C-alpha cells in the first residue's frame, strides 16, 4: 500500500473527488493543491476511446501553447551544407551534421527539441535508441522533419511552446500545459489549444466516444477529474 506524504494529504482535502470539474475550476483546484517547494508542472491526461494496436486509430500530433511551457527551450537541428547555415541563421541552439550525430550518440542530450532535414533522416534514424525513448526523435508527422526554409517557423513555434502528443500503449495521451505558477487563464488557453489539436487530429478509424475521461494534475498533486462535455467543447470547430 502506497503511503502519501503530509503535503499530499493536505492537498487532497481541497478536492471533492465526487465532482467532475469544469476546466477552469479544475485548474484553480490543481493550482491550490500545488504545495511543493518547486514550481510544479501542470499536466493533462486524456483516456481516449482508441485502440493503440489498431493502425487506423493511431493518434499523434502537435499543439502550440499560446503561453508557452514556462521554460527555456533549447533547439537542436540536424543539417549539413547550406541547410546547416540556415539552421544557424534561424536561431538553432545546436546544429550540425555527421559530427553532431556522433556527439548525440555519445550521450549529448542538452536540448529539448530536435529537428532534421529530410536528407539527414537516414543517418539520424540510427539514433532511435537514444532519442526515441525520450520523445526527441524528429518525425514528419510531428512537423520536425522539414526543409531548411521552414527552420525559422518551426524553431519559433518550439520556443513559444510547441508540444507533441501521442497515444501511449494504454490508450492515454499525457501532455504538459505549463507551470503551476501560471495564471489560471493562461493554463486554460493552453488547454484549449491542446484539446482543439487533439480533436482535429481524430484518427479516421476512431469509433464511439473519442475522449473517455480527462484529468488534470500537478507534478506532486492528486488528479482532478474534469467534466467531459466541457473539455470536449473546448476544441474542434
From Swiss-Prot:
It comes from Dehalococcoides mccartyi (strain ATCC BAA-2266 / KCTC 15142 / 195) (Dehalococcoides ethenogenes (strain 195)). Keywords: Repressor, Ribonucleoprotein, Ribosomal protein, RNA-binding, rRNA-binding, Translation regulation, tRNA-binding. This is Large ribosomal subunit protein uL1. GO terms for molecular function: rRNA binding; structural constituent of ribosome; tRNA binding. NCBIfam families: rplA_bact (TIGR01169). Part of the 50S ribosomal subunit. GO terms for biological process: regulation of translation; translation. Gene3D superfamilies: 3.30.190.20, 3.40.50.790. Pfam families: Ribosomal_L1. InterPro entries: Ribosom_uL1_bac-type, Ribosomal_uL1, Ribosomal_uL1-like, Ribosomal_uL1/biogenesis, Ribosomal_uL1_3-a/b-sand, Ribosomal_uL1_CS. It comes from the Bacteria. PROSITE patterns: RIBOSOMAL_L1. Belongs to the universal ribosomal protein uL1 family. SUPFAM superfamilies: Ribosomal protein L1. GO terms for cellular component: large ribosomal subunit. Binds directly to 23S rRNA. The L1 stalk is quite mobile in the ribosome, and is involved in E site tRNA release. The gene is rplA. The keyword tRNA-binding applies.
Amino acid at each position: 500500500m502506497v503511503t502519501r506524504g503530509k503535503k499530499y494529504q493536505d492537498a487532497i482535502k481541497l478536492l471533492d473527488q465526487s465532482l467532475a470539474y469544469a476546466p477552469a475550476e479544475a485548474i484553480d483546484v490543481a493550482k491550490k493543491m500545488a504545495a511543493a517547494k518547486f514550481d510544479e508542472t501542470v499536466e493533462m491526461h486524456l483516456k481516449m476511446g482508441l485502440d493503440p494496436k489498431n493502425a487506423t486509430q493511431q493518434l499523434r500530433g502537435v499543439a502550440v501553447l499560446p503561453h508557452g511551457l514556462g521554460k527555456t527551450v533549447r533547439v537542436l537541428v540536424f543539417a549539413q551544407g547550406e541547410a546547416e547555415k540556415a539552421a544557424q541563421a534561424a536561431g538553432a541552439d545546436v546544429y550540425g551534421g555527421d559530427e553532431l550525430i556522433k556527439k548525440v550518440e555519445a550521450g549529448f542530450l542538452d536540448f529539448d527539441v530536435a529537428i532534421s532535414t529530410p536528407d539527414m533522416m537516414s543517418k539520424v534514424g540510427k539514433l532511435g535508441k537514444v532519442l526515441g525513448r525520450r520523445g526527441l526523435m524528429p518525425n514528419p508527422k510531428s512537423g520536425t522533419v522539414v526543409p531548411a526554409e521552414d527552420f525559422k517557423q518551426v524553431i519559433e513555434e518550439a520556443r513559444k511552446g510547441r508540444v507533441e502528443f501521442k497515444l501511449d500503449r494504454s490508450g492515454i495521451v499525457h501532455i504538459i500545459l505549463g507551470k503551476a505558477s501560471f495564471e489560471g487563464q493562461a493554463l486554460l488557453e493552453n488547454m484549449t489549444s491542446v484539446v482543439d489539436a487533439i480533436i482535429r487530429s481524430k484518427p479516421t478509424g476512431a469509433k464511439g466516444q473519442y475522449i473517455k475521461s480527462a484529468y488534470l494534475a500537478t507534478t506532486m498533486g492528486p488528479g482532478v477529474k474534469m467534466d467531459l462535455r466541457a473539455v470536449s467543447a473546448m476544441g474542434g470547430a
